[in-house]
């Protein structure tokens, strides 16, 4: 049996588009808000499977992506929290770093927390960022909106997770 996210409890109106990593034009008519954790295998699946579709929609000016790196208390996801500290605020650089973090996830996914930081610095050559306030804002926003699981994606009235198929995603973007 496949687990399905209960979207009925999520308060989409409490999700904002002003904090997070913004990919694409501010003039785009729609915002695709993505709550992800870099250690989550389902977030990796979402990121990789939606990458081309979202990249095309951003390039065509249809959407602006707002990626919110969500720190989670779950032990396995805390490694993602550490990696979040190393993602740059520059959108293009951040997108590349997120891609690198997901590509190497199987390497660092079981490291001790200190080792994740060392891997980010020494192997991936990421620099630690002063983003604690932003991370706290995103966590508070997720709590207010009752977002419990990652990935959670909000596009207008639509709230979904990584199980969305490409055709449905494209239809939501085109609406």
Task: Spell out what each predicted region is.
Residues 32, 40, 153:
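Conserved S/T- and glycine-rich ATP-binding loop of Class I adenylate-forming
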Residues 23-25, 72, 162:
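Generic structural "secondary-structure junction" signal
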Residues 11, 28-29, 55, 113-114, ...:
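Short, flexible segments with low predicted structural confidence
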Residues 23-25, 56, 144:
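Sterically constrained small-residue positions within well-ordered secondary structures
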Residues 36-39, 44-117:
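Structural alpha/beta surface segment adjacent to cysteine/selenocysteine redox centers
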Residues 35, 46-54, 118-175:
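C-terminal cap of thioredoxin/glutaredoxin-like
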Residues 1-12, 167-175:
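N-terminal targeting signals for export/organelle localization
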Residues 13-31:
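A short beta-strand-turn-helix
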């Amino acid at each position: 049996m496949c687990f399905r996210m209960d979207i009925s409890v999520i308060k989409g109106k409490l999700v904002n588009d002003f904090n997070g990593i913004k990919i694409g034009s501010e003039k785009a008519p729609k915002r695709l808000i993505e709550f992800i954790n870099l250690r989550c295998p389902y977030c990796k699946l979402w990121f990789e499977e939606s990458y081309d579709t979202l990249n095309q929609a951003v390039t065509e000016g249809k959407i602006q992506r707002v990626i919110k790196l969500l720190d989670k208390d779950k032990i396995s996801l805390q490694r993602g929290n550490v990696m979040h500290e190393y993602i740059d605020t520059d959108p293009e650089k951040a997108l590349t770093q997120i891609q690198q973090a997901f590509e190497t996830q199987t390497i660092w996914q079981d490291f001790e927390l200190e080792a994740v930081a060392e891997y980010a610095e020494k192997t991936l050559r990421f620099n630690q960022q002063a983003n604690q306030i932003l991370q706290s804002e995103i966590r508070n926003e997720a709590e207010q909106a009752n977002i419990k699981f990652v990935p959670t994606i909000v596009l207008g009235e639509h709230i979904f997770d990584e199980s969305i198929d490409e055709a449905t995603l494209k239809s939501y973007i085109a609406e």
